Each structure stands twice: as structure tokens, then as C-alpha cells.
Amino acid sequence: MLLKDPILAFKQFYRQFDQQSLNALDGIYSEDVTFSDPVHIIQGSDKLKQYFESMCGNLTSCRFDFIDEVIGENDACFKWEMHYSHRSLKSNAPLRLMGTTFIKYSEKIDAHEDFYDMGAMLYEHLPLIGSAVRLVKSRIKKSS
């Protein structure tokens, strides 16, 4: 499935991010897409699909709300809020994460780069590490 507008296809894909939505990945990302986030750099749509399948396996829900965007002729930037629940984090309670995505595209997305706070996504929600991360953040806030 190739949608005419890669921006529309991208946003539609992430509005409800789950195992079923992954079927649309080939219509959105080019075969040789480069994907990066704070943890990974992935080359190729097959490897990206494997990464997303692994991620979705641990999520009980995930959706993105797009808050703002800047669209260029062949690139775009999105500010988003992710709403997710993860089996191993906070007893599967609903969580939120703010982030930004930068994409480059032609007919499909050729490059996708995510920016977000890994501590807010994961570390703050782990039993021992979480309290240490929150303590450090609060001390930094007080000193600035």
C-alpha cells in the first residue's frame, strides 16, 4: 500500500502503533530507509519491521498524538506525544512521552530520526534506577 502523501501515511501509521499497523510499513518506508532513535541505528525496511515487531511484542498499547509539524519539500519535523503501556513498566499503567521526529522523504520515507528522553521513556519507570534518575533530575532542576 503506497499512499500518495508520505506525510499523511506516516501520521496515519503512528496514530495507532501495533502489530496490525506494521502491515502498512512497506508502503510508508523505502526499502533502504535509515532509522535512528536514542538506542538504535537501523538500515533497511526489513530490519526496521523486525525492530518494530519486537517493540510491539512488549507493548499493550501505543499511539502517537501529533502536536506540531513543519513540512518542507522533502523533509518534515513532528512534535509528538506518545501514549503507551508496557508489560514491564509501572505494572502496565498508561505512560506518556514527548518527542520529536525528523524525516526525509520522496515517494516514501527515506530517513527517520527520533529524539526523546530515554530516561522519561524507560529508566524513570524501573524500580531501582527510576528513583535515582528522578532524584538526579530534581536536583538539576533545583540548581538551575
Question: Model segments located where?
Answer:
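A solvent-exposed, acidic/Ser-Thr-rich amphipathic alpha-helical stretch
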Residues: N23-D26, S30-E73
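Exposed alpha-helical structural elements
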Residues: A9, A24, K47, M121, ...
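A short alpha-helix capping/helix-coil boundary motif
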Residues: M1-L3, E31, F78-K79
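A beta-strand edge to alpha-helix "cap/lid" segment located at domain peripheries
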Residues: N58-R63, V70-S144
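Short, low-complexity N-terminal intrinsically disordered segments enriched in polar/charged residues
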Residues: M1-N23, G27, I140-S144
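Soluble or luminal CAZymes and related metallo-dependent hydrolases
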Residues: D5, K47, L95
